Design a protein with these regions (language model features):
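Positively charged, amphipathic N-terminal segments that serve as targeting/anchoring signals
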Residues: 1-125, 136, 239
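Glycine-rich loops and low-complexity Gly/Arg-rich segments
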Residues: 54-56, 84-87, 141-146, 166-170, ...
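Short C-terminal domain-edge/linker segments immediately following a structured domain
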Residues: 60-63, 90-92, 148-152, 172-175
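Short, solvent-exposed coil/turn linker segments
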Residues: 84, 103-105, 213-218, 232
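Extended, charge-rich low-complexity interaction segments
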Residues: 107, 111-116, 121-129, 173-188
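A short, gly/pro- and small-residue-rich
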Residues: 124-150, 156
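A conserved mid-domain beta-alpha-beta active-site/ligand-binding segment of alpha/beta enzyme cores
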Residues: 152-227
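Long terminal accessory regions outside catalytic cores
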Residues: 221-245
Length: 245
């Protein structure tokens, strides 16, 4: 069932992410809320505060200094746990803490193994840095609204294969993705669910044990529509039979 509003979706997302993180200590997870016009930062800060109450420390990482500074401003209680992708990578590859004002000032001893890294809004341009961050981290990682797919043109077959292998490691802890005439949802540990948009709202259409591609979604929606038409025609036939008696 689709959540009726953002706060319900958030609650579902947080619960699903906690469920996912409680499993594999080296898990690679994604969380996607793809609403048009969504202000992602407040959601991410609420998520970070929620996870910060757990046993494992968190690091909240952003693509650039501007986004990190905005997060520190809006979430001052998390400021010491906020940095950019590149700042964190430099710190994790060095025994010395980075200078104050450039990112994290509370390095985690032991190689950050127990930390949960939360990477927000990683794009294709960030792919190399994100891959390096993840390779240097032995603990759990969460990508929030990532956009790492594509961008492999011109890097050669070896590079493309390496990228496919890296992207294949990730599993959705939570996803709520509006599509044209439908919506896709996944809440760990349950299956992916596809919903069809009807005049009176969304209706469940199909479930999948993997993230369905466009062809699979279209096939499920067409099959669902055909089933609906068939039921309607049978109802009309029964009505006509009743009138003729």
């Amino acid at each position: 069932m689709l959540p009726p509003d953002l706060r319900t979706a958030e609650a579902e997302a947080f619960a699903s992410l906690r469920s996912a993180l409680a499993g594999d200590p080296r898990g690679r997870w994604t969380m996607e809320l793809r609403f048009e016009g969504l202000r992602l930062l407040p959601v991410v800060l609420r998520l970070a505060k929620e996870l910060a109450t757990g046993a494992a420390p968190i690091r909240l990482l952003f693509p650039d200094a501007g986004a990190a500074a905005l997060a520190r401003r809006d979430g001052p209680e998390l400021a010491e746990r906020i940095a950019t992708f590149s700042d964190h990578l430099r710190q994790s590859s060095s025994a010395l803490p980075i200078e104050a004002g450039e990112g994290l000032n509370a390095p985690d001893p032991g190689g950050s193994g127990a930390e949960v890294l939360i990477l927000v809004g990683a794009s294709q341009a960030d792919y190399g840095t994100v891959e390096s961050v993840c390779q240097a981290h032995v603990g759990r990682v969460v990508l929030v609204n990532p956009g790492l797919e594509g961008g492999a043109v011109g890097i050669g077959s070896v590079g493309r294969e390496r990228r496919r292998g890296f992207l294949a490691q990730w599993e959705a802890a939570y996803a709520l993705i509006p599509l044209a005439g439908s919506a896709l949802r996944r809440a760990h540990p349950h299956d992916w669910e596809l919903y069809r948009l009807d005049p009176d709202g969304y209706r469940f259409a199909a479930s999948f044990d993997h993230r369905p591609d466009g062809e699979e979604r279209d096939g499920a929606l067409q099959g669902d529509e055909s089933g609906g038409i068939a039921m309607t025609l049978r109802s009309v036939d029964r009505l006509l039979d009743g009138l003729q008696r």
